[in-house]
Amino acid sequence: MANTASAEKRNRQAQKRRARNVQVRTGVKSAVKKAREAITQGDGNAARDAFKAAARALEKASSKGVVHKNAASRKISRLAKAAAKVAAAK
C-alpha cells in the first residue's frame, strides 16, 4: 500500500506499463506460435511470411525492453533456421 502521493503515482504508472507489456508479449507469443505452425505444416511461403512477422514482433519487443535482446535474437535465429530448413526441403 502506497503511503505517499508519489508512490501512488508510480504504482499507477507501473500498472499502465505492465498492461502495455503484457499486450506486446502476447502479440509476440501469437506471432511465434503462428510461425511454428506454418513451419511444421511445411508450406515454404507461409512459413517465410509467418517468420518475417514473428521476427518483426520480437525485434520490436526487444527494442522496447519487453523481451531481452539476447532472448529475442535466440528465438529469431531458431525460427530462421527452421524456416530455412522448410524452404530447402521444397
Curated annotation (Swiss-Prot):
The keyword Metal-binding does not apply. GO terms for cellular component: cytosol; small ribosomal subunit. Residues 1-29 are annotated as: Disordered. InterPro entries: Ribosomal_bS20, Ribosomal_bS20_sf. GO terms for biological process: translation. Disulfide bonds: none annotated. Belongs to the bacterial ribosomal protein bS20 family. This is Small ribosomal subunit protein bS20. It comes from Anaeromyxobacter sp. (strain Fw109-5).
